[in-house]
Every structure is written in C-alpha cells, then in structure tokens.
Amino acid sequence: MDNQQDNHIKLLNPLTLAYMGDAVLDQYVRTYIVLKLKSKPNKLHQMSKKYVSAKSQAQTLEYLMEQEWFTDEEMDILKRGRNAKSHTKAKNTDVQTYRKSSAIEAVIGFLYLEKREERLEALLNKIITIVNER
C-alpha cells in the first residue's frame, strides 16, 4: 500500500472504520462458530452475540487496555473511535458501552483496511480467547 493511501485510511472517519470493523469481526466470529463449535443453525446467532455484542466488545476492550495490548497507533484509533459522535442511538446498551464497542471495531477496521493481516489475526484471536475465558 502506498503512503498516500496509508494516510487516507488513518484519516477516515472513525465510525467508518468501526463500520468496517464490525463486518470483519462478525465474519470472523461466524466462521469460528461454524467451523470450531459446530453448533446447530438455530443456536448460531445466540452464540455469536456472546462475541459481538456491544457489552462483550466493551469488556474485551477494557481487558486489552489493562494489558496494554495495543500499539500507540492503535491507541490513537481507539481514542478517535471512542470519542466519535454517532448520530444513531445505541441499541440495548448505554452510550459509554456503545462508544467502547465502536472503539475496538475502529481498530479492527483500521487493521483490515491497512492489510495488517498478522496484527488483525492476533487481535481477532485474542478477542475469541478472552470471551471464551469469561
């Protein structure tokens, strides 16, 4: 990826990064559930909520921040994602939780669009592990 495109991705609206990150996380979790957990179809959605709900994402973010898991660059994206003003109302959660969830999704979206596959894979695997240990 060239420098100009690199900078373009960093400058994207953090909620745009979160939008992309939400899709990436959802696909990763669905793949994990289908291939690893081999659950019945009617249970798949219920199981995926355990990983992708705003509450779960917020708890995971808090844990990862306590562990100082994120790079400085990722912390900048997290802060932008958390502080971004959304014009939609959070469903089934409070604003703080929604913002934390958007923050971790923004980092996922950033890593995906930057094509940082190893770091993205490490983060997605870490999310699965953390949720499984709860």
From Swiss-Prot:
Q: Which CDD domains match?
A: RIBOc (cd00593)
Superkingdom, taxonomy of origin: Bacteria
- Which Enzyme Commission numbers does its entry carry? 3.1.26.-
Record key words, sorted: Cytoplasm, Endonuclease, Hydrolase, Magnesium, Nuclease, Ribosome biogenesis, RNA-binding, rRNA processing, rRNA-binding
**Where found, per UniProt?**
Cytoplasm
A Gene Ontology CC term for this entry?
A: cytoplasm
Q: Which residues form the active site?
A: D22
As cofactor, the record names: Mg(2+)
Q: InterPro entries in the record, alphabetically?
A: Mini3_fam (IPR008226), RNase_III_dom (IPR000999), RNase_III_sf (IPR036389)
GO MF terms, alphabetically ordered: ribonuclease III activity; rRNA binding
User: Its Gene Ontology biological processes?
Assistant: rRNA processing
Function summary: Involved in correct processing of both the 5' and 3' ends of 23S rRNA precursor. Processes 30S rRNA precursor transcript even in absence of ribonuclease 3 (Rnc); Rnc processes 30S rRNA into smaller rRNA precursors.
Into which family does the record put it?
Belongs to the MrnC RNase family.
Its assembly, as annotated, is:
Homodimer.
Q: What is this protein called?
A: Mini-ribonuclease 3
In which organism is this protein found? Answer: Staphylococcus aureus (strain NCTC 8325 / PS 47)
- What taxonomic ancestry is recorded? Bacteria, Bacillati, Bacillota, Bacilli, Bacillales
